[in-house]
């Protein structure tokens, strides 16, 4: 089973926005059929984003709390030490930690961020598949 790194927007799609396109990944995580790698800074970013007013409104509308979403993170993500800098640098510094971890572990990277998507070929040279279908 190929490990996967999920950026914050993907995590929001999974457990805040309940995006139908994320249903296969959510099911795979819940069934233990997908191996999600993350770091403490990724969890910290998620906690910070969950406090944004537009995200908090969405949580309230769905009768969710930030703690519930962070609980999904804690239950399904396997924490890893921070990864060393990958050979390719993202223009969006906030996304670099996801790239670094994916490169270090040869993990699939799930992201919708344009600055990450434009790196698809470079990441492939490092053994990172960008947004691969399930299963992998």
Where are the language model's segments positioned?
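PIN-domain endoribonuclease scaffold, especially VapC-family toxins
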Residues: 27-85
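Short, well-structured N-terminal submotif of metal-dependent ribonuclease cores
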Residues: 1-38
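Alpha-helix capping/helix-boundary segments
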Residues: 10-11, 42, 115-116
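Residues at secondary-structure transition points
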Residues: 20, 37, 64, 89, ...
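Residues that scaffold the ATP/ADP-binding catalytic core of kinase and kinase-like folds
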Residues: 13-15, 49, 58, 119-120
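Short beta-strands and strand-loop turn motifs
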Residues: 6, 80-83, 112
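Short, flexible loop segments at the rims of nucleotide/cofactor-binding pockets, characterized by
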Residues: 12-15, 59, 84-91
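Acidic, PIN/NYN-like endoribonuclease modules and their adjacent C-terminal/linker elements
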Residues: 89-92, 96-99, 103-110, 114-136
